Amino acid sequence: LIYLLIGAILFGCQLNPSLSKSKLDIDRLSLIDEMIEKAIKKNKIPGAVALIAKDNEVVYKKAFGVKDPETGEKLKTDDIFRIASMTKAITSLGIIMLWEKAMIYSLDDPIDLYIPEFRTLKVLDNFNKKDSTYTSKPTNKKITIRNLLTHTSGMGYDEIGSSEIRAIIFKEKQKFMRNSVIAFSDEDVTIGEIVRRLAKLPLEFEPGVKWNYSNSIDVLGYLIEIVSGKTLDEFFKDEIFTPLGMNDTYFYLPEGKNSRLVKVQTKKEEKWVTFRHDRYNVNYPIEGAKKFYSGGAGLSSTAEDYFKFLSVFLNDGKYNDIQIIGKMTNKLLQLDQIAMITSDKHKGSHGLISTVVREEDLNKGNIGSAGTLHGGGYFNTKYFADPNEKVIGILLKQTRSISEHTSNKFNRLVFSSITQ
């Protein structure tokens, strides 16, 4: 009976037999189950899919909770999540691949060499809150590809960030779109049309002087289309998804996989309900024109697929003997690129792919080794990839308008399980 019970527990957790050899403490990892189940019981989250990989093998993969609040359908480990801003790392990798192949001359090239609409850049001077009118003045600097990769371009976002820039973008957007958030558009527009319009709007600050999370990776998605001669969707499939075997990652899901898309949930009167937004269609991965390839937030994926993507950065630029980028380039991606401009407002770091852990960050504890890449997405998805410990953690949820701490706890529990 004891052996049957142990077997049932291991099966339920989907623990890989290689876990015992992985230098991760099994007892400590079991605390992840306890933490997530407790969060579900206390109504903090409706569910999650968690994945942990060590030394190139998935050693833990488990689904918890409910996928659809209306039907009560349970989450499965191969369900598909809107990964939103986790798309950014994939788009940034695409830029690095083109740079490695000398299809982009330099990361310090001005973006206006490729997108002429950026030649007459202006920066915000004065803003009138009453009617969103503004004055602007010419910039002293040009936006470079590196600025775009590291969110130091001066651009903004239409859903988060500076209220002035949000208002300006929103006002411009109303001229050619319904009230939708750019990143999740289901309308009959292309990324090129959007970027060319954004290029004419004022920046929040001069390029290269501050960090500000922005639409800059959407600009880079359009740059990939210009340089490669392919749509961003085609480029991703040909150069990243097919080589890595990422068979469940899409801008728009094929009809046969629609049922695997997880519902976004929020709480209403302490009950989980399907989340809806008056400014965008939450079902954008399966509805609408299906023409808008947002390099900043448009992809949906699975935990397993994103593990394959992150594995590239833990293995000198390759996965399963498929070389995606060179070894030296991969080392470059682990370095902070914005140390010289870090301000009181933003004391963090950012590399060419994502946020990175620096030596001076290590005193915070349980955030990984120096060089660890980490990030997340708008619908409550998180990842990290530690190239020194060769450990990957992915926690996928689909929620909005709630506050909870399972992602931070997950990271801490994974790193504290490394005992050898």
Where do the PLM segments sit?
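Bacterial Sec-dependent N-terminal signal peptides
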Residues: 1-23
